[in-house]
């Protein structure tokens, strides 16, 4: 008795917890908006933009003053030896070299140095290239958004189609259940044979399995949609959009330009990067100019403790200057590099023709596929309506005693096959619509 009560309480808690979960209502637009904020691919693309911003700031930092501090304390346990003519050493034999150890047992060097770039063509071109790289990251972010919208749209439509399929399967289940009960009554009253009941029973058994499979497929489709949204799988959602034939009226092609495709815009940015890469090699021929300065102190003593006697043992020094570096000859290295980069630029130009032809072909293919899929869907819709009429007439004839049970079973099978064909055609038309809108740059 105790165990039974505990189980009941636990079950009640689960029911209350499930009821407390919020069901998120989502239209297709709301779903895409949610995905653009939560999808992991979008989040990573945003981080790529932050990385690009960091690269720009890193390049700017190289042009700012560079300051370094150095401290060197050494114990010279073996002093280096220098060779001097004997004439410099009193009492040494003339004409010989005398080895003399120079230095102190302890030495120190402390300094602060600063440098400022005045002119470096590579720096300015690199800064411009870094900003262009950031622009490229932004466009790749846009491409990620388009890909996510495409995936979410297809997953959303898959849920709607599976939902409609399940609803129709439920109706078929109820229809066959009624037909089975009626056939059993007719058999009991002597108006039908045992084989008639068996035929309907087979169809009913099949629709039960079909209903279970459709329920599972709807769950899988919803999980896929949540995955594309970047949403936890266990969160509950309810789709608010409905599928009507009007949904295919908003994919008409307007004016199209290659710039509407983000791939074309990315290629334009890649061209600018290639041009900047060439420019960077050219400016390497220019001289570099830097200012520098250093301030410090040195010490040399025979006692390590005296190194810390700042006032008496350390001697100041300082210097400032300007440094110019002029490239003269590098074995034609820059020339060879420049030729390679020009070839790469030519490849980018060739990619324009390749991309334009690819876009033209894609638009043509997607448009034809979209138009054909819509026509196929309309035909299958008409077939489904006709097969429904045939089934209803056949059933009425059978109930009136002027038709056979086999005709009803065949009409039912044709009706369910027509339903399957329609939903397949409907889903294909929806996918073709998404693909076509993406091909003309009208998806995002």
Tell me what each language-model feature is.
Residues 54, 147-258, 373:
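Periplasmic alpha-helical coiled-coil/stalk elements that build and connect Gram-negative outer-membrane
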Residues 20-72, 78, 233, 239-275, ...:
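Bacterial Sec-pathway N-terminal export signals of envelope proteins
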Residues 22-23, 70-112, 242-247, 292-326:
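Small/polar, glycine/serine/threonine/aspartate-rich low-complexity segments that form flexible
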Residues 1-28, 36-39, 423, 429, ...:
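Bacterial Sec-dependent N-terminal signal peptides
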Residues 57, 113, 277-280, 323:
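Outer-membrane beta-barrel architecture
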Residues 43-47, 60, 107, 118-145, ...:
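Sec/SRP-type N-terminal targeting helices
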Residues 61, 206-231, 385-442:
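Short segments within alpha-helical structural elements
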